[in-house]
From Swiss-Prot:
UniProt record similarity statement: Belongs to the NRP synthetase family.
Record GO terms (molecular function): ligase activity; phosphopantetheine binding
Gene behind this protein: rstn8
Enzyme's top EC category: ligase
The name this protein goes by in its record: Nonribosomal peptide synthetase rstn8
Catalytic activity from the UniProt record: restrictinol + glycine + H(+) = restricticin + H2O
Function: Nonribosomal peptide synthetase; part of the gene cluster that mediates the biosynthesis of the tetrahydropyranyl antifungal agent restricticin that acts as an inhibitor of CYP51 and blocks the ergosterol biosynthesis. Within the pathway, rstn8 catalyzes the C3 esterification of restrictinol with glycine to yield restricticin. Rstn8 represents an example of the emerging class of single-module NRPS-like enzymes that perform esterification reactions. Rstn8 displays strict substrate specificity toward glycine as no other natural amino acid is accepted.
Length: 1358
């Protein structure tokens, strides 16, 4: 840098200081600047003190580095503070550096309080920021204050100004704990540059002040000396290299299939040939893909690029209007989809040809083994499009980013090196296909010999740790949000974790640091997935530090002018240069030209010859250079936000919102907000409304009119409902605002723009519970501390209502004050499982009696409160009490069972009856080849303390009596006996041999029903238990208890015993109560033509066994779940009603649907018994379901489903009666039960643990309850079992298990189709209010079933 005679620094060396010995002070480093003698005359010309020139220079620096128009700093003038005084003389100053004004203009008005003013401490911003860590010390005599003495740790930087007629001087001191030496050095240089600008160009406009100097240029020349060359290849060529090198290596390991590289190559080549020959796919042809997580999605992607086209992923969960907009904007001519997504594609774009991809389609296709035979077009090259990805667009239309082969190849080459993806990597593919991260996962792996591991959609949502372990994943790229849902102990084989897609959180980093090779990565989709990485994340690195560029160069430019570089350390817009920058937005030159530079910036030439075909993309992200050139992320310069990893343009949401509002509101705005005490952000829509709230943010004047009148609230709630319905048609769920607030007017800045900061600030001052009341019909608006003056007076509530509201809040995850006495439990999201939790919490925490039946009968809070009664405490049962009176003398009974079990008398801890289902299961095992044994094979962590682990298992074995339970035959019934004994371990040499032999070992009377094994190499634990002593909830508690004991976490006290449970469900008689008999006679009263599957009896001695299975993900169409809640119905009711409709269509007796009867397995935990939800024991119950279909064809779905739910509620008091005792009531009841051929099981998602495979176990579970293929043949005694596992959002996972001697796979697939159709029609009718229309009747002769057994006796039902 050249210096004129007006400004000639002579000394700017940095001087280290000695360390401070005082705890409250921090060590100091400093640098000095000698100012020119002309400083005084220059200041005198403006009639201001010389110190004002220094202050202006520092203000210009702060404005540049912090991107704020009115920086502030503190000053101390030693004229007003004697030596040795404290800092009470500290004063704060600020300067308004408005664009359009010159430096000279500012200096001339230095004393104008609208330009330069003083602030009191209460006018300072509430949060401490870099603007407040600066102090200017005005010293009257050089040497009076030592600039290297330790400084207050609250101050990051102190500038000492020493005025002098001959040689004025500055010393800059900084706290190295707050400001790095490198950053301080650049601050010093920038201050020199700012002062030089003041002296040399006082007429320059503030906006044109450029503090980028020669020192910054030299530093960037060092950091950005290298720009990677493009990888000029096709991505399929890189893939072919791997195929040639390792054809047998695993390429894809998915939940629905595995492929090695040779197989993947051949399948994708075959499909590519079809795309070329049958559909005319050539270069630049865009092919849309619509797949769930599947191996076939990978085949389809590779096939499209091999054929020369570019693929575009469409999310099957997005609304049809979104699909149509994407297809229109990209001019896609073909859809590839799966069988599951076919209906979605046909509904969304019926005019677009589609091809369903599945395994069978390849059998008849020619085998194009060599890629050369597939790609016939000679025009395909690296600059042709490889894929298109759509992101949110501010104009309401998605932006379609076109990425070329050269960009993709350049990106995956850099990504694989930076993320250490090698042939030994097993890479998790978690991200949605519409999220560009998925493309990085897939192609970085497939071009470097790694294996892509793909969990199912259900596993992604509910059992990710289990999927990671089952698939052998050792490397993953996840958002912080998702990574925080896992723990290192759950996934011990995961060795490399990269955080990306959203800013990393310190909590997530702390969890994973030192447990895995942890990296942090950044990249907009326009830069082909990733372009910046922090390769070694540690606790000492700031979460904002995203590292250095990979495959590109990163520059920081002025946010409003990319032809100006920002000084080192200053905040600016991140500009990416390199071959991985995309081509642009498809058919959108306006938006392309706005962010993709047509010409290199003018400063580029000063850094040497530009690289070939280099491209530039303005990210819109704000960043600055940190130590060593690392990039520090600082946020956005526009309205683009990220929510749960999804990129959202607020402008697009606002565009759709305005469309939906039409004439209902003149204006609206959408913002990402963080309500007070809320752990997660959400999208909030602010809608102008005549009776809306006032957003006046003056501290002394809290907002008024916060509570709408009941009438206004009702009208606004109606408007919000219309908005939600309309926006669901055009936007994906993650882009729909989760909160709507009526405002009298939108706040504006002084320049007349929307004041988004004011909107965000308003929400930070109020709780989500309070904000939610504006769109809630509940007139009892809650307060939230800061908003007491808003709330309308609460209605008088009874103590029972108040207590119940608190319990609802705990169960439903809401604030207590957001629940009103007229709210509906089911409408607030409650279901059968939530009702069970509510009942147990009421008994345990409030000593109130409430039943699940009560919850469903009276879901409104006020009505429900009228039903609660004080809890009658369960009496503690003494051992053996349930066996007396009427049995043998206890001493004789104990002697009898001790002899049978081969133990001493005092080892018999307790004896009690069996549940009806326990009896059924055990007798079924004893009568045939169905062992009913369940196995859990657990892979133990390598660093597991084995003795400690064995000790934890032993303690849990003693803690839960059910693990020490045996069955003994006593007279004509089975009883269960708890034995005091120690846990014994088997130590097999071979895991495989043991598991196979153990699975075949049948249970026996008088013997233990659990087996525990640890392989000789201590790598696997095998827990085997008979199904009569555990259920899914119990298994989760058992494994969770082992984990807790191992980690020295105290176990909660036992709240209820199995004996107490049995005392409530057993009458200790051979028959049922009169009430039970009356209920079942009425409930199962036969009607003409009623039954289950109407199939012929081929052999009365044959016992069905469900030994095969198929599965499918079923989603509810948009609006179904809210409609269910509005009608007080549950998803389980819809599932049950749809199955009834499916069975009704198979009736052959008449055109009028008949009644249907089928079996079900229920949790059995609906008793009002405190702690029953945590009971470690089998509480399942087996019962018949009867649904009268004769009137259904004339009913509206809401009425039909309400009847189904009412019947289920009425059954609750009798659900433990047991199938055998129900069948024995009389001949008519038995005849109806004999018609049951199918079993429907609805699995809820339990709180905390969904199954053993998701338990927080010290090691992953390789196989568990969900590995149904092995266990179904032992457990299912029906010919057809339908198991539906509810998902947290919008659907369920259905598995049909069947006897392959009775059903063909085609039959079952058709039944699944019929079932899906019934769900669709019922759900659609529910939202539209139509009558029930059963699917087209299917006659028996259209099925190809070989026959089905109708059991004729109780023994056949067991």
């Amino acid at each position: 840098m050249s210096h004129s005679s007006h400004y000639s620094p002579v000394d700017s060396g940095m001087v280290p200081s000695s360390s401070s010995t005082e705890d409250h002070l921090s060590p100091t480093l400093s640098a000095s600047i000698v100012l020119p003698a002309q400083l005084n005359p220059f200041a005198k010309a403006y009639d201001i003190p010389p110190s004002s020139i220094v202050q202006l220079g520092w203000a210009l620096l702060l404005r540049c580095h912090l991107a704020i128009p009115s920086p502030c700093w503190s000053t101390i003038d030693d004229k007003t503070m004697p030596r040795g005084s404290d800092t009470h003389a500290l004063q704060w100053e600020s300067l308004h550096l408005e664009e359009g004004r010159s430096i000279s203009w500012i200096l001339q008005r230095w004393e104008d309080p609208s330009v330069h003013w003083y602030l009191s401490s209460d006018q300072l911003p509430g949060s401490k920021s870099p603007t407040l860590t600066t102090m200017l010390f005005l010293v009257k005599e050089y040497g009076l204050f030592d600039p290297v003495t330790p400084i207050d740790p609250g101050m990051g930087t102190i500038i000492y100004f020493y005025p002098s007629d001959e040689q004025p001087r500055l010393h800059i001191s900084w706290n190295p704990d707050v400001v790095s030496s490198g950053h301080a050095f650049h601050l010093t240089r920038s201050l020199e540059h700012a002062l030089q600008t003041i002296f040399l160009a006082p007429s320059v406009d503030i906006r044109d002040v450029n503090l980028f100097g020669i020192w910054d240029h030299q530093q960037l020349l060092q950091w950005n000396s290298y720009c990677p060359d493009p990888v000029d290849r096709l991505v399929q060529e890189m893939f072919q290299d791997v195929v040639a090198a390792t054809p047998e290596a695993s390429a894809v390991a998915a939940w629905d299939g595995e492929l090695n590289y040779r197989e993947l190559d051949r399948l994708s080549s075959r499909l590519a040939g079809v795309l070329q020959s049958d559909f005319g796919v050539v270069s630049e042809t865009i092919v849309a893909l619509c797949f769930e997580k599947s191996v076939w999605a990978i085949v389809a992607m590779l096939a499209v690029v091999k054929a020369g086209g570019a693929f575009l992923h469409i999310d099957p969960q997005h609304p049809p209007a979104r699909h149509q907009a994407m297809i229109k904007s990209t001019a896609s001519k073909l859809f590839l989809c799966s069988e599951q997504t076919r209906d979605t594609v046909v509904r969304s774009v019926p005019d677009c040809p589609s091809l369903v991809i599945h395994r069978e389609m390849f059998a008849a296709q020619p085998d194009h083994a060599q890629q050369d035979t597939v790609i016939s077009s000679g025009n395909l090259g690296p600059t042709n499009a490889a894929y298109v990805v759509c992101t949110s667009g501010s104009t309401g239309t998605p932006k379609a980013i076109v990425v070329e082969h050269v960009s993709l190849c350049s990106s995956v080459t850099a990504q694989a090196k930076a993320m250490d993806i090698t042939a030994g990597s097993r890479v998790l593919q978690y991200a949605a296909y519409t999220f560009d991260v998925s493309i990085g996962d897939i192609f970085a792996a497939l071009t470097h010999g790694a294996c892509i591991c793909i969990p199912s959609n259900w596993e992604r949502a509910h059992d990710l740790s289990g999927a990671i372990n089952r698939l052998g994943v050792n490397q993953a790229c996840l958002t912080s949000t998702v990574a925080s849902l896992l723990t290192p102990v759950e996934v011990p084989k995961l060795k490399k974790l990269t955080l990306g897609g959203e800013p990393a959180t310190q909590q997530c980093i702390n969890m994973w640091v030192d447990k895995v090779a942890l990296k942090n990565i950044y990249g907009p989709a326009e830069c082909t997935v990733w372009c910046i990485i922090q390769p070694d994340v540690s606790s000492g690195i700031a979460v904002s530090n995203i590292g250095h560029a990979i495959g590109a160069r990163a520059w920081i430019v002025h946010p409003e002018n990319h032809d100006r570089l920002m000084p080192i350390g200053a905040v600016g817009e991140l500009l990416i240069e390199g071959p991985l920058v995309a081509r642009g937005y498809l058919n959108d030159p306006v938006r392309t030209n706005a962010v993709f530079l047509a010409q290199p910036p003018i400063w580029l030439a000063s850094f040497g010859p530009p690289p070939p075909r280099s491209r530039f993309y303005k990210t819109g992200d704000l960043a600055r250079y940190g130590p060593g050139g690392a990039l520090l992320f600082e946020g956005r310069k526009d309205t683009q936000v990220k929510l749960r990893g999804q990129r959202i343009e607020l402008g697009e949401v606002e565009y759709r919102l305005h469309q939906a509002l039409s004439d209902l509101s003149p204006s609206a705005a959408v913002e990402l907000v963080h309500p007070k005490e809320s752990t997660a952000p959400l999208l909030c829509a602010f809608i102008t409304w005549d009776e809306g709230i006032d957003l006046d943010l003056q501290p002394a004047k809290p907002p008024l009119s916060a509570c709408l009148t009941p009438n206004a609230r009702k009208r606004f709630n109606h408007t919000v409902s219309l908005l939600q319905t309309e926006m669901e048609r055009t936007l994906p769920a993650y882009m729909i605002p989760g909160l709507c607030i009526p405002v009298h007017k939108l706040p504006l800045t002084t320049s007349g723009k929307l004041d988004r900061k004011a909107l965000r600030y308003f929400c930070t001052q109020h709780s989500l519970a309070f904000l939610s009341t504006f769109e809630n019909n509940n007139v009892n608006s809650p307060t939230d501390g800061a908003t007491d003056s808003f709330a309308a007076p609460l209605e008088t509530v009874s103590p029972a209502e108040s207590t119940l509201a608190q319990l609802w809040a705990q169960v439903l995850g809401r604030k207590t004050d957001s629940i009103g006495r007229k709210d509906n439990f089911l409408s607030l999201g409650g279901d059968s499982l939530a009702a069970m939790r509510l009942v147990n919490r009421a008994a345990r925490d409030a000593q109130l009696t409430l039943t699940v039946a009560d919850v469903f009968k009276c879901p409104v809070l006020a009505d429900q409160a009228s039903l609660v009664r004080p809890l009658v405490q369960t009496r503690n049962l003494v051992p053996f009490e349930l066996m007396a009176p009427g049995d043998l003398q206890i001493e004789d009974l104990v002697a009898y069972v001790a002899e049978k079990c081969g133990v001493l008398h005092d080892q018999v801890e307790d004896i009690y009856p069996c549940t009806p289902l326990q009896d059924e299961m055990m007798r079924d095992s004893l009568s045939g080849d169905r062992t009913q044994m369940g196995q859990e094979v657990i892979l133990l962590a390598e660093d597991l303390d084995i003795p400690r682990y064995l000790s934890a298992c032993a303690r849990v074995f003693q803690r839960f009596p059910i693990l020490r339970t045996r069955f003994v035959q006593h007279s004509d019934r089975l009883i269960q006996v708890v034995i005091r004994e120690n846990l014994g371990w088997q130590r097999p040499e071979s895991l495989t041999e043991y598991v196979e032999a153990d699975a075949k070992e049948a249970p026996a009377l008088n013997k233990p029903l659990t087996r525990w094994a640890l392989t000789s190499d201590s790598t696997h634990c095998i827990l085997t238990m008979h199904h009569s002593i555990f259920d899914g909830i119990s298994l989760g508690h058992i494994l969770g208890a082992i984990y807790a004991v191992y980690q020295s976490i105290p176990l909660p006290p036992d709240s209820v015993s199995f004996a107490a449970f049995l005392a409530q469900i057993n009458e200790h008689t051979s028959g049922l109560s009169d009430d039970s008999k009356q209920f079942w006679r009425s409930y199962l009263r036969p009607s003409p033509g009623s039954g289950d599957l109407p199939l012929p009896i081929v052999d009365s001695t044959y016992r069905p066994c469900a030994n095969r299975g198929t599965q499918r993900l079923v989603t509810f169409q948009s609006g179904v779940v809210p409609a269910l809640q509005q009608h007080g119905l549950t998803e389980a009711t819809l599932i049950r009603g749809a199955w009834a409709c499916t069975l009704a269509q198979l009736q052959t007796s008449s055109s009028t649907p008949s009644d249907v009867v089928f079996g079900t397995i229920l949790t059995g935990r609906n008793l009002h018994l405190p702690g029953v939800d945590a009971l470690v024991a089998p509480t399942l119950t087996h019962a018949p379901i009867r649904i009268r279909m004769s009137a259904a064809s004339n009913e509206k779905p809401a009425s039909f489903l309400a009847r189904v739910q009412a019947d289920a509620t009425a059954m609750i008091p009798f659900e433990h009666d047991g199938m055998d005792r129900i069948r024995a009531i009389d001949a008519q009841v038995r005849a109806v039960c004999d018609q049951m051929q199918t079993l429907l099981v609805i699995q809820p998602i339990p709180e905390g643990l969904t199954s053993a495979s998701t338990s927080p176990f010290p090691g992953p579970i390789l196989s568990g309850p969900r590995v149904e293929a092995r266990e179904m043949r032992h457990f299912h005694w029906y010919g057809l079992l339908v198991e539906c596992t509810l998902l947290p959002t919008n659907g369920f996972f259905v598995r049909m298990c069947y006897d392959d001697k009775l059903f063909s796979s085609e039959d079952v697939e058709r039944l699944l189709d019929d079932y899906s159709q019934a769900l669709h029609e019922l759900g659609g009718g529910l939202t539209e209010g139509e009558e029930v229309h059963l699917p087209t009747e299917r006659k028996l002769d259209t099925l190809t079933l070989p026959g089905l057994v109708a059991p004729s006796g109780a023994e056949d039902m067991v």
